[in-house]
Regions:
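Conserved short loop/turn motifs at secondary-structure junctions
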Residues: 109-117, 270-274, 298-305, 338-339
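Core structural elements
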Residues: 257, 279, 283-292
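Scaffold signal of the M16-like zinc-metallopeptidase fold and its non-catalytic homologs
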Residues: 61-66, 236-263
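Conserved thiamine diphosphate
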Residues: 163-173, 252-275
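Short acidic (Asp/Glu) and glycine-rich catalytic loops that position anionic groups and cofactors
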Residues: 207-212, 258-264, 291-298
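N-terminal export/assembly segments and adjacent metallocofactor-ligating motifs
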Residues: 1-238, 275, 360-366
Length: 370
């Protein structure tokens, strides 16, 4: 290999799976990028997100990519910009932020972010040191709701830690892994072929993954919570729940039984447009499987819609009453990450400022109160 050519190991940045990749550079310029066969996670496979030509020409070396700060020249909306130095940009931004903080208090500034990769700790560190509690991102239409509702239900966030390869049944609820997460689909497909695992798909559309399912429920959009409650009702009504787990770990089961009874199969069928037979079949299939995983889904009721909160709670309850919490083949509750406090500087934000977070009183579970 030429002295000017080097191969570096990295992780693909385009989704949370972070597949291992090999990046080849020549004279400091990337000339090739491909999956790393030695990465135990993806074993050399990468999906269409990392199309080499699109990545290099459309992103890394795109001639329109900004490489230096631009400052607006003229009126807002005029489309005129002038290039300035990094020092000038930092100085002007800092001066403006300090002025806003002195005039209106640090909470006047709200920050936002994209999907988390590795840099979000810097984002929170900055906001905490600046003194503003008002920070957020796309998580409220992604899986932030799962992240706070599941701990409220059973003490941990586990729907992103499904045992895909150990489950006897995989339930993909509003999740098309063939199209959006091919690597995860590989594990599901392997499990189905090697262990005979079953697949249930809940999706309004006959998606790629729905076509592979043993049972597909073509749900009416926005009625996921009703379906989950209907399944809970069948499981309780037919005595299919895990008595040992419920007796040992669950509180309020009698109240749950009363609430679920308000959603008999016939009523749920009218709401969801799914036949009564399929609703019963899905409940029995999930409850009687030796193990079943129900990972979070973005296009079901999890991520958006007025019933998202109820859907997530109901799905969490489904996992619990069937004993699929923290067990092989179900959802696993992992210990929290141990980041040094200095990473986030949460302690730098006094309680007085935390109380000023927008929505603090209306949505305590999503604020510092929670």
């Amino acid at each position: 290999m030429s002295e000017n050519v080097e191969v570096l190991r990295a992780g693909c940045y385009f989704c949370h799976v972070r597949c291992g990749v090999l990046v080849t550079k020549k004279d400091g310029r990337i000339i090739d990028i491909k999956g790393d066969p030695d990465c135990p996670h993806n074993k050399g496979y990468v999906c269409q997100r990392l199309d080499k030509q699109r990545y290099l020409d459309g992103f890394v070396y795109n001639p329109n990519r900004l490489k230096r700060p631009l400052k607006r020249a003229g009126e807002r909306g005029g489309g005129k910009w002038e290039e300035i130095s990094w020092d000038q940009a930092f100085d002007e931004i800092a001066e403006r932020l300090i002025d806003l903080r002195e005039k209106y208090g640090p909470e006047t500034l709200a920050f936002t972010e994209g999907t988390a990769r590795t840099w979000t700790w810097l984002h929170y560190k900055f906001t905490n040191l600046f003194g503003s509690p008002n920070t957020g991102g796309n998580g409220t239409i992604c899986y932030s709701s799962d992240m706070w509702l599941e701990p409220c239900t059973y003490g941990g966030f586990c729907s992103d830690k499904s045992d895909w390869v150990g489950a006897d049944l995989v339930v993909l609820w509003g999740r098309n892994t063939i199209a959006s997460e091919p690597l995860l689909w590989h594990w599901v497909d392997t499990n189905m072929k090697e262990r005979g695992a079953k697949l249930m798909v809940i999706d309004p559309r006959c998606s790629e993954v729905a076509q592979k399912a043993d049972l597909w429920l073509q749900i009416r959009p926005g009625t996921d919570a009703a379906l989950a409650l209907g399944m809970i009702n069948v499981i309780i009504e037919e005595d299919l729940y895990d008595h040992e787990f419920v007796d040992e770990w669950c509180y309020g089961f009698d109240q749950l039984k009363e609430r679920a009874a308000e959603y008999p199969v016939e009523k749920v069928s009218e709401i969801t447009w799914i036949s009564s037979e399929k609703i019963r079949e899905s409940a029995r299939m999930y409850a009687t499987a030796p193990s079943a995983c129900l990972p979070w889904g973005q296009k079901g009721g999890d991520a958006s819609g007025i019933n998202a909160t109820s859907t997530i709670r109901a799905k969490a309850i489904l996992r619990a009453i069937t004993g699929n919490i923290d067990r092989k083949g179900g959802e696993l509750i992992a210990p929290p990450s141990r980041f040094p406090p200095s990473f986030y500087e949460h302690y730098a934000l006094p309680q007085e400022q935390r109380d000023k977070m927008i929505g603090n009183d209306r949505f305590p579970g999503l604020t510092y109160k929670g």
